[in-house]
């Protein structure tokens, strides 16, 4: 896990996957690389990006730039999420369940990296459907973006938190 110091904000970044593609030309194969990168501040902000280039470091750099531009704020309560939610993107679905203190981060692969950079420490997850890293990253972020704090839900309904 790397920390990048940009001005006042320190970002955590993770490379999820690097893919190599080949274009066959008369003189041989021409390779290009793509990299899926997630970036977060460890305190409720997370973003994902896909960078493509002829070299791996350049693809990672482009992915990090795109991830920083797509950062969104998510609701975190005491190191976990307020309630259970399913994030969907394409054929990938991710079930996210809140967990009590001390449970840890029960997640694998792409989902784990997204949750780590977002700053979530106690959560249970299950990948349903596709296990494609592109879809899992986007489904996880989509599920986290759908979360709202109980206070905000109560205010939108015009009720107190205890009534909900």
Curated annotation (Swiss-Prot):
GO annotation, cellular component aspect: small ribosomal subunit
NCBIfam families, sorted: rpsE_bact
Q: How does it assemble?
A: Part of the 30S ribosomal subunit. Contacts proteins S4 and S8.
Role according to the record: With S4 and S12 plays an important role in translational accuracy.
* Gene Ontology terms, MF aspect: rRNA binding; structural constituent of ribosome
Q: Which family does it belong to?
A: Belongs to the universal ribosomal protein uS5 family.
Tell me which species this is from.
Syntrophus aciditrophicus (strain SB)
Fetch the Pfam families from UniProt. Ribosomal_S5 (PF00333), Ribosomal_S5_C (PF03719)
Listed name of the protein: Small ribosomal subunit protein uS5
